[in-house]
C-alpha cells in the first residue's frame, strides 16, 4: 500500500494553526507528522500551504483522534470492517491504536515507540534474523532495524492495521530503500503461517499478541511448540503478557503462558511486562 505523505492533525495542532492565522501571522511552525519532525506552513485567510500543497483549514476536531487529508477533506484515521480500528494520539508523539476501544499498546508511562526499544533490547537483535509475530504499527520492527537486525520477518493479520501503518509516520516502511530489504512484512495470520517457517531458522523472536480473549490461538501450546521449533537453540523470545486481572478474566494468563512455554522447551524469566524465554 502507498504511504501517506500529507499532514496529520490532532486537536491541539489545529488549535495552534488557527490561533496563528487569527493573530495575523503569515507562517506557523510546528509538527504535522505527530512530533516526528518540525515544519513551516504558509498561512492565508481562507487556506494554508504545506510542502507546496494548498489545504483548507481543518474544522473543529474531536479529541483523541488523528485526522488526515483524503483528497477532499480532513477525516479520522479509522476504519470499521469487523471491528472499529483507530489510530490514537499520545502525549509522546508516536501514536497507539485501538480495536473496538481497547488500547493495543502501553502509553501510560512512556511512548509506545520507547517501550518497544526496551523490549527489543532484551532479544539483542543486532545481526540476527528476528521473527515479529504480530506486527501491529511496526514499532518492534522499527526498533529492530535501528538496532541492526539482519532481517525481520513480520506478520500482521488485520488489513486495517496495515492501512493505519501507511498513515503513521512512526511506522517503518518495508519498501523504503534505506532499509535494504531487511524488513519483510506479510499480511498473514501468523498462527497459520508459522508452519511454513523452517526449523531453527530464526535467531530471536518478539511475540506481542492481542489479549487472550481476542486471539487465544496465539497463546496455545500448538503455537508455542512452533515458536520452539523455528527458534535456534539459545535463541531469545520476548512474550508480552501484561497483567490481566484474574478476578475479571477468571484466568492467570501469565502463569498459563509460562507453563506452556516451559513445556515447549523454553527457560523463562520475568522481564518488563512479559517474559523473556531462552530456547533450550
Predicted regions and their residues:
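S-adenosyl-L-methionine
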Residues: 155-199
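N-terminal auxiliary segments of SAM/dcSAM-dependent transferases
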Residues: 1-90
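Conserved SAM-binding loop of SAM-dependent methyltransferases across substrates and taxa
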Residues: 137-149
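A short glycine-rich, Lys/Arg-flanked "PGG" loop and its adjoining helix->strand segment in the class I
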Residues: 219-233
Amino acid at each position: 500500500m502507498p504511504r501517506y505523505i500529507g499532514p496529520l492533525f490532532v486537536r491541539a495542532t489545529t488549535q495552534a494553526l488557527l490561533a496563528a492565522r487569527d493573530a495575523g501571522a503569515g507562517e506557523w511552525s510546528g509538527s504535522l507528522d505527530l512530533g516526528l519532525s518540525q515544519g513551516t506552513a504558509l498561512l492565508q485567510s481562507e487556506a494554508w500551504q504545506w510542502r507546496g500543497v494548498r489545504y483548507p483549514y481543518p474544522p473543529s476536531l474531536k479529541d483523541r483522534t488523528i485526522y488526515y487529508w483524503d483528497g477532499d477533506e480532513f477525516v479520522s484515521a479509522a476504519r470499521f470492517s469487523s471491528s472499529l480500528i483507530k489510530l490514537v494520539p499520545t502525549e509522546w508523539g508516536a501514536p497507539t491504536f485501538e480495536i473496538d476501544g481497547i488500547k493495543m499498546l502501553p502509553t501510560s508511562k512512556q511512548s509506545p515507540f520507547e517501550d518497544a526499544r526496551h523490549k527489543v533490547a532484551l532479544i539483542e537483535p543486532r545481526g540476527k534474523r528476528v521473527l515479529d509475530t504480530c506486527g501491529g504499527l511496526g514499532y518492534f520492527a522499527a526498533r529492530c532495524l535501528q538496532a541492526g537486525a539482519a532481517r525481520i520477518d513480520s506478520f500482521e493479520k488485520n488489513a486495517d492495521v496495515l492501512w493505519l501503518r501507511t498513515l503513521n509516520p512512526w511506522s517503518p516502511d518495508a519498501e523504503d530503500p534505506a532499509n535494504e530489504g531487511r524488513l519483510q512484512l506479510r499480511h498473514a495470520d501468523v498462527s497459520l503461517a508459522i508452519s511454513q517457517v523452517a526449523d531453527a531458522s530464526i535467531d530471536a523472536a518478539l511475540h506481542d499478541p492481542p489479549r487472550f480473549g481476542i486471539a487465544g490461538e496465539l497463546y496455545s501450546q500448538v503455537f508455542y511448540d512452533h515458536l520452539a521449533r523455528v527458534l535456534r537453540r539459545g535463541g531469545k523470545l520476548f512474550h508480552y503478557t501484561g497483567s490481566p486481572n484474574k478476578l475479571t478474566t477468571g484466568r492467570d494468563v501469565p502463569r498459563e503462558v509460562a507453563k506452556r512455554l516451559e513445556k515447549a522447551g523454553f527457560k523463562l524469566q520475568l522481564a518488563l511486562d512479559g517474559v523473556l524465554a531462552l530456547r533450550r
